[in-house]
């Protein structure tokens, strides 16, 4: 039985290192771009609500899939998140597009949390060893 704790620890670390910065500075960043404070609050709340509603849907899709789609779902959400935050570097984007892209980036980042947890369970179920507590502690 192969121990994947180190690999899973790196996955947790990179996820939390990337997503924590986006969440921690969301208000400051969007206000500096000229997004009104009420709109910032609304967008971040919508990202959280969308995450709450879509997480069970994605979990259901992953559970019902005939083949292992969890990694593909994580990859898709990661790419979407990267694209949304990378587009923030483009000068001259309309203000609302900037705000919505940031919201979608935060949403796609938030929705990955249960998928990362499910990845540990799936690997353990497939016969691999992962010390979730140690890996999550590193991440």
Language-model-derived ranges and their functions:
Residues 1-48:
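Helix-loop boundary and gating motifs at the non-cytosolic
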Residues 13, 84, 91-115, 119:
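Hydrophobic core of transmembrane alpha-helices in multi-pass small-molecule transporters
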Residues 50-52, 130-139:
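Glycine-rich segments within core transmembrane alpha-helices of 12-TM secondary carriers
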Residues 53-67:
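Helix-to-loop junctions at the C-terminal end of transmembrane segments
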